Swiss-Prot record:
GO terms for molecular function: triose-phosphate isomerase activity. Its EC number is 5.3.1.1. Substrate binds at residues 169, 207. This is Triosephosphate isomerase. The gene is tpiA. It catalyses: D-glyceraldehyde 3-phosphate = dihydroxyacetone phosphate.
Amino acid sequence: MNPMQADAKQLLQEFKQLLQENEITEEKCNIGLAPVTLALTSTQAELANAARSVFTVAQDVSRFGNMGAYTGEVSAELLKDSQIEYVLIGHSERREYFAESAAILNAKAQNALNAGLKVIYCVGESLEQRESGQAEVVVLQQICDLASVVTAEQWPHIVIAYEPIWAIGTGKTASPEDAQTMHAKIREGLTQITSHGANMAILYGGSVKAENAVELAACPDINGAL
């Protein structure tokens, strides 16, 4: 729920300057920004004159479709009409603090995909689940939950993001080896579900910083960072 508008504008100017100075071209990587809802359209407008294309990502979308009367909600259709390209679904904070179940996330994914949005779908396991040996089962089940509402034609419009929840704020660290092991399992699961699985992007949503970014990027099944 931050930063404030003035701070966000300053950060955006600094971001655009970095793009220009470092010549980070589209051939090198895709880049997206996920500002708070109130800053979505202003961010998109500001990025229109950036040195390269940067897509705008909504942090959430309503589980209710058809532009109904749901006070406070932001529909997939409204995001699409505002020319937003991607939306985050299933982020660990939404799962934890808002108790978003598989049914709720499925509804959000369906609405987003049917409206023509692309989905960044987050999966991950807790510390308790990992220590009990259930990590792979939990993560693959989350992907299977998504698969139950996705058509064959929609898979190319989905990006998977793995969040090692057990390593966020617990004092434990997910090594590049840990991340690659889970990403490989996710890749294996995706290839069993869809013919697009081998080519789908799988992002790492752990603590990515300058000190470990290169090592993480070198892992064969890690295609970027969240």
